[in-house]
Amino acid sequence: MRHLHHQTSQIKLWAVIPAAGSGSRFSKTELKQYQYIQDATVIEHTVKRLSQLPLTGYVLAIGKQDTFASTLSFQDKHKAHFCNGGVERVHSVLNALNYLSQIAEEDDWVLVHDAARPCVTFECLNTLVKNAIETNQSAILAIPVRDTLKQVNQEQQIDKTVSRELLWQAQTPQIAKIGILKKAIETALKNNLTITDEASALESIGESVQVVMGRSDNIKITYPDDLELARLILQSQN
């Protein structure tokens, strides 16, 4: 944390955690962010990791019917803010940015991080924020694609092998200035563009986004058996 303090004394850093997802690959009664790993929920682990940074505050975009999130023991709970999520992740992020714009400045930095990525390391977080601030440029954590990629046709037959040389797999957090990211998402939605992450919105308005080397253990919990993997990763990191 102290690595950033001298840089962020004048700079405000916020986090947005979209957590209104239905967890479609989990059963309807179970949201992946509220599954337990040891004695805490996935989202509590996630907030704990992000809170290693000198955050001014963080916004959790949660489902309208969600009464559970506010009862959790989040790290630095006095810095927690809640807003309603949206239909898709992108709408949840925009709602959180609209909320933030009432209490933060347009030039403040915001990290957007998946609720179901509890294993991100402090080193990765620190490097990401440091790079963004030093270059004054949006950035994302990502890792180079390691596996051989195949492009297939509708019959599941291989058409060709795709060169992986310049391909990176995007992760979160993704960091940008609040005003720029808000404008990018609003513009993309207005133009009916498919937005899969913050970087895709930023790219669509011509904003430069750099990739910062992440780690393969920054997994996103998507399927029930990912919980056990996340538990093992957290255990080994500690």
From Swiss-Prot:
The record marks 25, 32 as: Transition state stabilizer. Catalyzes the formation of 4-diphosphocytidyl-2-C-methyl-D-erythritol from CTP and 2-C-methyl-D-erythritol 4-phosphate (MEP). InterPro entries: IspD, IspD/TarI, IspD/TarI_cytidylyltransf_bact, ISPD_synthase_CS, Nucleotide-diphossugar_trans. The lineage of its organism: Bacteria, Pseudomonadati, Pseudomonadota, Gammaproteobacteria, Moraxellales. GO terms for biological process: isopentenyl diphosphate biosynthetic process, methylerythritol 4-phosphate pathway. HAMAP family: IspD. This is 2-C-methyl-D-erythritol 4-phosphate cytidylyltransferase. Keywords: Isoprene biosynthesis, Nucleotidyltransferase, Transferase. It comes from the Bacteria. It holds the Pfam family IspD. GO terms for molecular function: 2-C-methyl-D-erythritol 4-phosphate cytidylyltransferase activity. It comes from Acinetobacter baumannii (strain ATCC 17978 / DSM 105126 / CIP 53.77 / LMG 1025 / NCDC KC755 / 5377).
